[in-house]
């Protein structure tokens, strides 16, 4: 044997003229099984094109050697030499995981369908509208006329308690029918007009009371007005300017 032969391949009793075969020296016990988690990145199954993933550049373009492709060997159906691909991306193919009879702890990489891998979740326009509304200008709080209406209702109730009560009061208060409510309104208006002749003779229930809204200045408006006033009244003294010195020199020369 040559000197470059590894030590574990050198036979102890080496006789001249006799050649040893590797299968006589090596034994299956010398090959250790994979330790821990084992993942294979290249796989060629029985289905051929529909059961292949990983880098199959070692085929060197001989894709007809794949099982199931001996009859139909077309280079256009296969990718280039140095491309990584997973052929199980078609929706028609069904991937069936079969455990390896030799390697018990071999785990295949998960299959990702092409329709699932290329489809992205659609972004609804509602999300964009909500974002635009959030970044929009702040809206001023709305002024409601509910307190004014409550005060008017309390005044009317106090006046009705002090005044004379007619038969139409109960019907108007319970809101029974349209005719009874109209009679109650007439009785209320007549009783109030008798007690308070200075009031205008109009039906108070038909005309809604106007909302007395007084819009006061908010804190932001007051701070803004103070800021603008301070900026307008700001006076900066930068000292004597160069133009003044030039004019003074010109006056002296004259």
Swiss-Prot record:
GO molecular function terms noted in the UniProt entry: cytoskeletal regulatory protein binding; small GTPase binding
Electron transport among keywords: no
Subunit structure of this chain's protein: Interacts with RHOQ and CDC42, in a GTP-dependent manner, and with SEPT7.
Function in brief: Probably involved in the organization of the actin cytoskeleton. May act downstream of CDC42 to induce actin filament assembly leading to cell shape changes. Induces pseudopodia formation in fibroblasts.
Protein name (record): Cdc42 effector protein 3
Membership in a protein family: Belongs to the BORG/CEP family.
Sorted UniProt keywords: Cell shape, Cytoplasm, Cytoskeleton, Membrane, Phosphoprotein
Compartments it resides in: Endomembrane system; Cytoplasm, Cytoskeleton
Origin organism lineage: Eukaryota, Metazoa, Chordata, Craniata, Vertebrata
Organism: Homo sapiens
Tissue specificity comment: Highly expressed in the heart and weakly in the brain.
């Amino acid at each position: 044997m040559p000197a470059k032969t590894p030590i574990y391949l050198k036979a102890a009793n080496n006789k001249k003229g006799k050649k040893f075969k590797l299968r006589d020296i090596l034994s299956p016990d010398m090959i250790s099984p994979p330790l821990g988690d084992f993942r294979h990145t290249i796989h060629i199954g029985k289905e051929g094109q529909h059961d292949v993933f990983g880098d199959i550049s070692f085929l060197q373009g001989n894709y007809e050697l794949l099982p199931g492709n001996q009859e139909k060997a077309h280079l256009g159906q296969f990718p280039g030499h140095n491309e990584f691909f997973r052929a199980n991306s078609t929706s028609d193919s069904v991937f069936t995981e079969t455990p390896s009879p030799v390697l018990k702890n071999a785990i295949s990489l998960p299959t990702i369908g092409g329709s699932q891998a290329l489809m992205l979740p659609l972004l609804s326009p509602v999300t964009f509208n909500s974002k635009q509304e959030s970044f929009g200008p702040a809206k001023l709080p709305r002024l409601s006329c509910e307190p004014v209406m409550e005060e008017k209702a309390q005044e009317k109730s106090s006046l009705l308690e002090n005044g004379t009560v007619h038969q139409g009061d109960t019907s108007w208060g319970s809101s029974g029918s349209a005719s009874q409510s109209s009679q109650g309104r007439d009785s209320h208006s007549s009783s109030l007009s008798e007690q308070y002749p200075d009031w205008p003779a109009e039906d108070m229930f038909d005309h809604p009371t106007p909302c007395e809204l007084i819009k006061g200045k908010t804190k932001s408006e007051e701070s803004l007005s103070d800021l603008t006033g301070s900026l307008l009244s700001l006076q900066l003294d930068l000292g004597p300017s160069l133009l003044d010195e030039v004019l003074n020199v010109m006056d002296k020369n004259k």
